[in-house]
Regions:
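All-alpha prenyltransferase/terpene-synthase fold signal
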Residues: 1-193
Length: 193
């Protein structure tokens, strides 16, 4: 995760005002003691499988996003924070109950996707909408590792473009196929890896 991106997300949400601004954790991400409320496995989950960069950092590193890397990192962090409010341990927003976590998560999805629409990047809007949907399917099936793989593959598709392997992996996830996790992990790898 990029601490700078999370700090930008924190500031953006405060500036938006409204209910979401009241839920922003007051502690700086750079100085937060992550162990205070979050189990170690939840911290690892929020960073992506095997300690990889966050999906936002990965998406922002690609050739399709490099001209606006900070904006892409911020909007993907917003969407990923929404996902973590639903299924993990958020890093920026603290909601006191499950209903508020769900609403705040949905709001962050909307904020991130709206910023992406403003950039005119409709393929990435579709990709991240698929990522949200497919990771929710994986979570509902108790497949957290599959959800992680979906996020990493979705981030790679935003930064580098989709591929037939990635589209095939998404179809496998939708079908509930047992080989979906390996296909998704493979589609998340750099070309030629």
């Amino acid at each position: 995760m990029s601490v700078a991106a999370l700090e930008r997300l924190r500031e953006m949400l405060r500036q938006q005002g409204g209910l979401i601004a009241t839920l922003v954790d007051r502690a700086s991400v750079a100085h937060a003691d992550l162990d205070r409320e979050v189990a170690p496995e939840a911290v690892a989950h929020s960073l992506g499988e095997n300690g990889l960069d966050s999906p936002a950092s990965l998406a922002a590193e690609g050739p399709l996003t490099e001209a606006r890397s900070e904006e892409y990192e911020l909007l993907v962090e917003a969407i990923y924070e929404g996902y973590l409010l639903h299924y993990g341990s958020p890093r920026v927003v603290r909601a006191p109950d499950a209903d508020l976590r769900l609403l705040a998560g949905d709001r962050l999805y909307a904020i991130g996707l709206a910023r992406l629409v403003e950039l005119g990047d409709t393929p990435s809007v579709a990709e991240l909408a698929d990522t949200i949907t497919l990771s929710a399917l994986a979570q509902s099936a108790g497949e957290r590792q599959l959800a992680d793989a979906i996020w990493l593959a979705g981030a790679r598709a935003v930064g580098w473009g989709s591929s037939e392997a990635h589209r095939h992996a998404k179809r496998l996830v939708s079908a509930g196929a047992p080989e979906a996790i390996e296909a998704m992990r493979t589609s998340a790898l750099p070309a030629g890896a």
